[in-house]
Amino acid sequence: MDYRVILLLILEGAFALWLLYRAGLMKKPAYAAAAVILVILAFGARFAVLDYQTLDYQDFLSRWVDYFRRSGGFRALREQVGNYNIPYLYFLALFSYSSISDLYLIKLLSIFFDIILASASMLLLGRYTQSPARRMGLFFTVLFLPTVILNGSLWAQCDSIAVARAVLGVVLARDDR
């Protein structure tokens, strides 16, 4: 595995910690220590399965990125490629410019949205309770849900992107935005 993949995964873990810090949940040393340990465990679980390739990845996602790579990246978006929504195809086209394996980039994108989903869930709960323990507990519950870990990190699927947007939509609707 490329060292850049490990670095990007570490940056995503740091981003998760930053979101908790920005939410005011790391003021107590015990909470900060727990957050660091849980982030290490959550991202360790994801790291352990990053190399796995599903048939879906081999038969579709990798071929779509390869098509973008051979056809000029973003210019290839003029053609019908795959059956995913257009914003996701923009990410695949972007990945075609990188020398990092598209398997890892696809999975890292999903992991990024695992964090957004956990944060959005925490934001929604924050509308009903200010308890730092409950909010942080929900953040890590979402990050440790088996379906969340497996969907992006193992299967290279993008469900966290859609679910994160849906939860953020509920937060914004609740706030009348």
State what each model feature region is:
Residues 2-59, 111, 144-146, 150:
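Transmembrane signal-anchor helices characteristic of membrane glycosylation enzymes that use polyprenol
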Residues 135-173:
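Membrane-embedded helix bundles of polyisoprenyl
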Residues 2-4, 86, 100-119:
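Loop-to-helix entry region of an early transmembrane alpha helix in multi-pass inner-membrane enzymes
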Residues 15, 19, 108-129, 168:
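Transmembrane-helix motifs of polytopic, lipid-linked glycan transferases
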